[in-house]
Design a protein with these regions (language model features):
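Sec-dependent signal peptide recognition
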Residues: 2-10
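Sec/Tat signal peptide C-region and signal peptidase I cleavage site
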Residues: 15-19
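N-terminal structural module
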Residues: 20-72
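Envelope-exposed proteins and targeting segments
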Residues: 27, 36, 54-56, 75-79, ...
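Mid-length scaffold segments of soluble, non-membrane domains
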Residues: 64-142
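Short strand-turn-strand beta-turns centered on an Asx-Gly dipeptide
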Residues: 149-152
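Flexible glycine-rich active-site/ligand-binding loops centered on an Asp-His dyad
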Residues: 154-181
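Cysteine/selenocysteine-centered motifs that mediate thiol-based redox chemistry or coordinate metal-sulfur cofactors
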Residues: 179-190
Length: 190
C-alpha cells in the first residue's frame, strides 16, 4: 500500500512538469530563458476563418491573470508559435503589422519602428513558415527580444522593453488577433 501512495505522490509531483498538448503540439509546462525558469501561463490555437493557423504559448516568470500583468511583468518572457499550416513570409509580416497597429498607438509604433523593421526583415529572410515550424520570441531584459526559428536564433536581439510589450499586445492587447486566444493565454479556457 505504501508503494502505491509513493507512486501516486511521484506522479502528482511530476504532473506540473508534463507538457500541455494542443492539436498534437506539445508545449512544456516550464522552460528556461536566460537562466530563469518560466511557466506556461496559457496556450491556445489561433484560427482564421475555419483554418487552424498555429498553437501559441505564453511563458512568464509568475502567472498573470490579466493582460496588463503579463505585458508589464518583469523579467524574461517567451511567446511560442507552432505552425499548424503553411504561411508565406508576407502573410506573417502582414499579420504582425496588423496586430501591432490594432493594439499600439502611433507614438508607440514609431518608437519601436527600427526593431519592427528588423523583425520583419528576419521573417522575410526565413521565408515560408512551414507546418510544424516552431517560432519563438524570447525577451531578456538586458538584451531585448530574440527571434528563434526551430531553435536557431535569427539575427541579433531587438532592443527594448517597449518593443516586447508592443509585440505582446498583438495577442494580449485591447484588440487582440483573437479574443479567446487572449483569454486562454491568460489561463482561461479557449
Amino acid at each position: 500500500m505504501n508503494t502505491v501512495f509513493r507512486l501516486l505522490g511521484l506522479a502528482l509531483l511530476a504532473a506540473p512538469l508534463a507538457a500541455a498538448e494542443l492539436e498534437g503540439v506539445a508545449l512544456d509546462k516550464r522552460v528556461q530563458v536566460d537562466g530563469e525558469e518560466l511557466q506556461l501561463n496559457g496556450a491556445a490555437v489561433r484560427t482564421r476563418v475555419i483554418f487552424k493557423v498555429y498553437v501559441a504559448g505564453l511563458y512568464l516568470p509568475v502567472r498573470a491573470a490579466t493582460a496588463q500583468e503579463a505585458i508589464e511583468a518583469k523579467g524574461p518572457k517567451r511567446i511560442v508559435l507552432v505552425m499548424l499550416r503553411d504561411a508565406t513570409a508576407q502573410q506573417f509580416v502582414e499579420s504582425i503589422d496588423a496586430g501591432l497597429r490594432a493594439n499600439n498607438s502611433e507614438g508607440e509604433i514609431a518608437a519601436v519602428k527600427p526593431q519592427t523593421d528588423e523583425l520583419m526583415a528576419m521573417i522575410r529572410a526565413v521565408g515560408e513558415a512551414k507546418k510544424g515550424m516552431r517560432i519563438v520570441l524570447d525577451y531578456v531584459p538586458r538584451e531585448g527580444t530574440t527571434l528563434f526559428v526551430d531553435g536557431v536564433a535569427q539575427g541579433k536581439p531587438m532592443a527594448g522593453r517597449a518593443f516586447n510589450q508592443a509585440l505582446l499586445r498583438i495577442w494580449l492587447g485591447e484588440d487582440p488577433v483573437q479574443l479567446d486566444l487572449k483569454e486562454a493565454l491568460l489561463g482561461g479556457p479557449q
